[in-house]
Amino acid sequence: RGLGDVYKRQRLSSIKAAYNLGANAWVLNAGADSWTLEMADGAVMNGDSQEHIKEAIQVMSAYCDVLGVRTFPKLVDRDEDYNEIMFNKVKELSSVPVVSLESATLHPLQSFADLITIAEKTGYTPGTKPEKKVKVVMTWAPHPRRLPQAVPNSFAQWFSKVDWVDFTVVQPKGLELDPKFTDGATIAYDQDEALKDADFVYAKNWSSFENYGQPNDGDKDWEVTMDKMNL
């Protein structure tokens, strides 16, 4: 079996997983290890792009049994990013199953790994009902650069639906995530109060969904300190 990957920093864990399953894996960084790809349908190929994504993905998927793809948002046009134009184009053109190694809005493998880790750490047995729910808090934290929403979107999407977890998302006003991913979670704005008695704290930065792509790196009060971890 062969797994072809188009992505960057996710590579080691995905390659290891492929090897564990008895598959061969190789990596192609689009634009670095290959020609620059043209995305637009019907484009005249007389610009800077040397190859069209239509031909590239069709050929790559012919060589693979599974195609792992990682894409990133531009954080400029929310509709463009949240419509997952790049990732959906790959799915449309591929003749084999496509696995998301992260897209413009979601990072499902990361959230799956996080869920497994927390279940292992708590000793939770799937299918059972714990005496007390595990309190998991995802808190916004400052960062010097504006970061995508894919990781927190997926984390919220998964943990808000887990019946053995009491899940809270806490952030400054104006940095709420897309409600379709946080539905079922407790939404809070007081970090100290939210962190009280937490079993797990997931500190993550994300740029604004409402004022799309805008950072909020000035809130140093939102740094997760040891004092806050001990609340």
State the predicted function of each range.
Residues 2-7:
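Short, small-residue-biased leader/transition segments that mark boundaries at the very start
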Residues 14-119:
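Phosphate/diphosphate ligand-binding glycine-rich loop within oxidoreductases
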Residues 21, 93-94, 163, 181-183:
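Short, structured coil segments at secondary-structure junctions
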Residues 51-52, 83-84, 150-154, 185, ...:
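Charged helix-capping and loop-helix junction motifs
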Residues 111-139:
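Short internal alpha-helix immediately C-terminal to a glycine-rich phosphate-binding loop
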Residues 129-131, 160-162, 228-231:
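Short, conserved loop/helix-junction motifs that constitute active-site signature segments
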Residues 136-170:
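Conserved anion/nucleotide-ligand pocket segment
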Residues 180-231:
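Rossmann-like adenosine-cofactor binding region
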